[in-house]
Amino acid sequence: MNADSAQLEVLKSVLNSFSLATRLQINFHKSSMYPINVEASVAFALAVQFGCQLGSMPFTYLGLPVGTTRPKIIDLLPLVDCMERRLTASSWFLPQGNKLQLVNSMISSLPIFFLCSLSLPQGILKQLERIQRQCLWRKYGQEKGHSLAAWPLGCRPKMKGGLGILNLGLQNDALLLKYLNKFHNKADVPWVRLVWDSYYF
């Protein structure tokens, strides 16, 4: 919506009506306003009028960094931290087959939501790949494990002599291509209809 005082009052009135109808109390003090291309003084005045906090881009929504530009590496470090926390010391004592199962079933599946939504920088993909390799090859007492096979070979399907480990870079590209497929085929999805109706009518 536009940075307009009157529209803001209408929005607050709608939210208050929703609160009265559903008995769900809205806590405006815990809400945040994220202005885009709005002067700081105007944004601050609107936030005071609405009774909420004034946020800034990028912000986190459902764990994803949301902003008007491509996320930087520092914005995606929480994903790396999350995967490293799952790389517990107990995995060092597992047999090699169990480590492979751990990599395929848990470590490689953690970033799927990010891979579906964002084009991850190569720096982040390399760090995630490092965590996969550590989980698979590192043994107790070692800071880093010595790879017993080249990583591209490990990422091949098992029927082609590989270990079936998910290549996160290729997975990222494949998951993002589904949006292009939906757009090209004019899928019955709100965002597809909006773009086609707005720019390609």
Language-model features: where?
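Nucleotidyl polymerases of mobile genetic elements and RNA viruses
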Residues: 1-201
